[in-house]
UniProtKB/Swiss-Prot annotation:
Keywords: Elongation factor, GTP-binding, Hydrolase, Magnesium, Metal-binding, Mitochondrion, Nucleotide-binding, Protein biosynthesis. It is found in: Mitochondrion. It catalyses: GTP + H2O = GDP + phosphate + H(+). This is Elongation factor Tu, mitochondrial. Belongs to the GTP-binding elongation factor family. EF-Tu/EF-1A subfamily. The gene is TUFM. GO terms for cellular component: mitochondrion. The keyword Hydrolase applies. It comes from the Eukaryota.
């Protein structure tokens, strides 16, 4: 998923 232009994996920020 992608939120606020940031890349997420399994709904956890990386």
């Amino acid at each position: 998923a992608v939120e606020a232009x940031k890349t997420y994996v399994r709904d956890k920020p990386i």
